[in-house]
A protein has these predicted regions:
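C-terminal outer-membrane beta-barrel translocator/porin domains of Gram-negative envelope proteins
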Residues: 2-143, 147-151, 155-157, 199
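Amphipathic alpha-helical segments in well-structured domains
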Residues: 57, 170, 205-206
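Short glycine-rich, acidic/polar surface loops and turns
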Residues: 132, 170-178
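Outer-membrane beta-barrel transmembrane domain signature
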Residues: 151-173
Length: 213
């Protein structure tokens, strides 16, 4: 059963937003990137809505290639959403982390929990470290195998003072495989969580088809 605070948000509402993204993409190539960086910033700005909330998104990716063909990649990702008129941010606008930003955890199953419902947070952030393992299956050119270490957090509750805001650092590590096939890019990951909140739900294996690079 939803809490009284969530039940107050039920029903129809009107929302009109302007979304934009500024993207600086200086990668040497989109798949199997080995050098360069990518930086982007976006906003969701309410134009005319029943409730006004501003969302900001920032991400930074940097790739470095070493002489031994090892490619390391560091990423930072952050999102913030806050009300502009002292109203609660709607449950449909609250934040979570994309699946590839925190591997080893079930999508949408971390962060604040209200009466058993995962309601997302006002803040979401993640950092990722990846390093290729070129000594594994080097004969397959369209295949990347990499070690990864992920750090992430989803927290913040604006509609209740009695719910744990879930400000807890989550971490995981494992091995990921990206493979460009005739049917499209495939992505696999095997992960183990290292730290988590008691309410978080984890998963060891993840698979994605048609990942955007």
């Amino acid at each position: 059963t939803a809490s009284n605070s969530l039940q107050k948000q039920s029903g129809n509402y009107f929302e009109n937003k302007f979304n934009y993204l500024i993207d600086f993409d200086y990668r040497n190539q989109k798949f199997q990137t080995s050098e360069g960086f990518r930086l982007n910033f976006g906003q969701g700005i309410p134009i005319y809505s029943d409730e006004y909330a501003l969302k900001n998104t920032f991400s930074l990716d940097k790739w470095i290639k070493f002489d031994n063909e090892v490619v390391t990649n560091f990423t930072f990702y952050g999102q913030i959403i806050n009300s502009l008129n002292d109203e609660d941010v709607r449950i449909t606008d609250r934040l979570g982390l994309p699946r590839k930003k925190l591997r080893g955890f079930k999508f949408g199953k971390i962060g604040p929990v209200d009466n058993g419902d995962y309601v997302g947070g006002n803040y979401a952030t993640a950092m990722n470290f990846n390093s290729t393992l070129p000594m594994l299956l080097p004969s397959i050119e369209a295949l990347d195998i990499r070690y990864f270490f992920d750090i992430g957090n989803v927290w913040g509750i604006d509609y209740s003072d009695t719910i744990d805001d879930s400000n807890k650092i989550r971490t995981s590590t494992g091995v990921a495989l990206d493979w460009l096939t005739p049917v499209g890019p495939l992505s696999f990951s095997f992960a183990q969580d290292l730290s988590k909140a008691d309410t978080d739900k984890t998963e060891t294996f993840q698979f994605n088809l048609g990942t955007t690079f």
